[in-house]
Swiss-Prot record:
Mainly expressed in roots. Keywords: Alkaloid metabolism, Hydrolase, Serine esterase. It holds the Pfam family Abhydrolase_6. This is Norfluorocurarine synthase 2. Its EC number is 3.1.1.123. GO terms for biological process: alkaloid biosynthetic process; jasmonic acid metabolic process; salicylic acid metabolic process. Pathway: Alkaloid biosynthesis. GO terms for molecular function: hydrolase activity; methyl indole-3-acetate esterase activity; methyl jasmonate esterase activity; methyl salicylate esterase activity. The lineage of its organism: Eukaryota, Viridiplantae, Streptophyta, Embryophyta, Tracheophyta. Homodimer. InterPro entries: AB_hydrolase_1, AB_hydrolase_fold, MES/HNL. Belongs to the AB hydrolase superfamily. The gene is NS2. It comes from Strychnos nux-vomica. PANTHER family: METHYLESTERASE 1, METHYLESTERASE FAMILY MEMBER. Residues 11-121 form the AB hydrolase-1 domain.
Amino acid sequence: MEVANATQQKHFVLVHGAGHGAWCWYKLKSLLESSRHKVTAIDLATSGVNPKRLDEVDTLQDYCLPLLELMAAIPQDDKVIVVGHSYGGFCIALAMDLYPKKISIGVFIGSIMPDSTHPPIYFFNQYYEWNPDGDDSPDTKVETYGCPDQPRTVIHFGPIYLSTKLYQNCTSEEIELAKVLVRPVTLFSEDLSKLKAFSEEGYGSVKRGYIICSEDKAFPVGLQHWLVDNVGVSEVKEIKGADHMPMISKPQELCQCLVEIAEKVV
C-alpha cells in the first residue's frame, strides 16, 4: 500500500463493537501503520483488557468513557478520524456530538448510525425490526443481574453464534481467537431509551462515512443500505465478501476503504 507522506498522515481512532476490544483491530492497525498513519485502538469499559465489570457501568457514556477521555486529551488543533464498528457506532456518534471540532469524519462499519432527529433508541429498535431474531442462537445465553426492580440484561455470545453470524468468512484460527477473547455484553437499552437525539450542531456538523459489509449475517445488509439512504453520508464504500468482522476477514480491503475516505477529508 502507498506510504503516506507527512501531509497525508491521518490519525485513526478505532472503536470496537459489543463484546470485542482493541484486539480485533490487530490486522488493520498494522496495515494502517505500515502506511505511516497513526492508529489508536481502544478498549471501551468492560471490554478487552479494560478492568471494569458490567455491574460498574450503568450508561452508554460510562461505557464510552475511555474514548471520551482520549478525545478530551487530543489537542484542540488536531483532528482525528473516528471509526466505529457495529454497536461502536453509538460510541463514535457520542464522541462526534461532544467533540465535533476534533473529528474530521466519523466512519461507520456494519454499524448503527444515528441521525440528529431521532433518539438513539429509534435506531436500536430499527436493528431488531430488520433482524427480529436479534442475537438469538442455540448457544447465546441471555441473563439478568442487578436489582429486581431494575434488572440488567447481559448477553454471552456462544461459539456457534460467533462462527456462523459474526466470523463466518474468517479462518478457524481467527474464530478460536474470538472464542477466547470476546466478553459478555450489555447493550444499555434502558439508558438509550432516556437519551435525546444527538445534536445537529455537534454530531450533525461532522462528516459521516459508511462501509457496507456485503455478507454480514449479524447486522442486516438491508439495514446498512437503509441507514446510508435515510441518515445520509458523504462517503460510502462496500466490501464484497465481508462478514460482520471485515477487520479480520477483509483487512486489506477495509484498509483501502479507510485510506480512500481519509484522502478526501481535511
